[in-house]
A protein has these predicted regions:
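Conserved acetyl-CoA-binding loop of GNAT-fold acetyltransferases
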Residues: 164-168
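Conserved alpha/beta-domain cores
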Residues: 1-155, 161-163, 175-177
């Protein structure tokens, strides 16, 4: 991380709130221009900590979490930028809103919780052509007026860029696989 910071890298993603707190709290004081993205699942009971630490939460995927984030943001006086996670492969083991429910969920987040998502995020199923999932995500974003697309990881980020990714998650290419 220190080597990346020395090169000027300032946008980092984290999978877990507690790990991020340990890793970034002191570094934020040293590097006030850091931008932290939560790219892993967020438990509702961690919404307060996530709002305090992260600039972007990319894993908004259920009404209860939207409510918890809205409450935490109101109390903290700051709202992180939000992405709705779409489970484009409709995999049971993955988080995210089903593609057919995405429009209604985005509308509900806006209407019922007063939150304005700025983009969408997806993780395509392993073994399937990623481009199909990226195209689907881009289509959902376009019809909902969302400009940001977080899609593509170390193995498929080039394809994601071709389909309009505005950010990619390439941590394992830079830092190696998680232990």
């Amino acid at each position: 991380i220190e080597a990346m910071l020395a090169t000027g890298q300032r946008i980092f993603g984290e999978n877990r709130v507690q790990e991020a707190q340990a890793r970034w709290t002191a570094r934020r004081a040293e590097h006030p221009d850091l931008e932290l993205h939560l790219i892993g699942p967020l438990q509702t009971n961690k919404a307060k900590e996530a709002v305090a630490l992260f600039d972007v939460v990319e894993t908004l995927d259920r009404p209860r979490l939207a409510g918890a984030l809205a409450d935490a943001a109101s109390k903290a006086g700051r709202t992180p930028r939000l992405y709705v996670q779409v489970n484009t492969g409709e995999e049971e083991q993955k988080a995210g809103v089903a593609p057919l429910e995405a429009d209604a969920f985005i509308a509900s987040v806006r209407r019922d919780y007063g939150l304005e998502p700025e983009g969408l995020m997806c993780i395509p199923p392993a073994g399937e052509p990623a481009g199909l999932h990226f195209a689907l995500l881009a289509k959902i974003a376009a019809r909902n007026g969302l400009a940001k697309l977080s899609m593509g990881m170390s193995a498929d980020y080039e394809i994601a860029v071709l389909f309009g990714a505005t950010s990619v998650r390439v941590g394992s290419a830079l830092f190696g696989l998680r232990p």
